[in-house]
């Protein structure tokens, strides 16, 4: 079969560019309650309908006084009322008057300053300033969170906890979001046995489906269907086409290398289209991208670490594009190797490593002892993917490298 790409495989950056160029965002939008919008992508801008909080409020507990010059120690006021959250003082303050005010409570008319309670003493209704106060009035502006008409979120934003909280604080109860692609996941292999079932010699418990579905769920995506199929070309072909009929994206793991039982790539060529095959990358060389039934198809390697890493590098950005957001790569930072690392040169490598911060703030990478792409446990302790160029072989302690941080934004 003719291959329109280098025999050693495509560089990762070129492969990603080809994938993204082949995709356009899914059409449409759906309105969801705010509680269901976490991780979804906004379909349109949302503006504040009113200023928030909508009134001037005390930043701390104390006493509100009229907007007179900065008071001096020994100044006195008569306490005429109280303002609490949900129970504001209804009158206006005159010079020489004060009201007790709690954090978050509205300031009364003509109230221009809050005196922190630590700076005053009160006897009956007489308030006395004990020490100098700052020029800070300790007042939250009426439009501190948002002004009426201000954009709260723009179109194409992936919504986090802070976005949802801000929208809620501005009275927004629901939002129009972009549709999410339904993912169809196909796991292939004669050797696979469901977890919990007895297995014969030479078989393994199937874990790639669990790994990928959990990873995609952590990334805010949803696997609509998950199938495990033996290495039978007819059954695999039917499963691929069935997934393409009900899902917007089809993902497989295993069967994309060049072995006698690797049927996925030839089936894709027969029943769909192969855009490219093989990556110039370790781990993750056996990788296929194309179309099946008109749907984007991602053929991930069968080794679990390679499947997870290629999913992060290529599938995750593609899903972001389909949702209508700008694909955001994992954060990158520079680190130094904490110890020598031996490897064979020839392919660029994404090596799992732990991040250690020294007492002086230096960032060190501790490479996991085994970089075998079949070793699932090496993913659990990894904080970083070290970006090792193809031309570098054995690396010395202190070698400076770029690394991808395996952490998602919190807010």
Regions found by a protein language model. Give the residues of each.
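Predominant activation on well-ordered alpha-helical scaffold segments within soluble catalytic domains
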Residues: 16, 20, 61, 117-118, ...
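Short, glycine/charged-enriched hinge/interface segments at domain edges or termini
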Residues: 2-13, 31, 63-230, 369-370, ...
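Solvent-exposed alpha-helices and their adjacent loops that cap or buttress functional pockets
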Residues: 56-58, 69-72, 90-94, 107-109, ...
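Flexible glycine/proline-rich
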Residues: 16, 30-35, 39, 44, ...
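Structural signal for hydrophobic packing residues in well-ordered secondary-structure cores
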Residues: 20-27, 45, 107, 153-157, ...
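Helix-rich terminal scaffold detector
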Residues: 1-13, 175-300, 304-310
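Intrinsically disordered, low-complexity, positively charged segments
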Residues: 7-74, 350
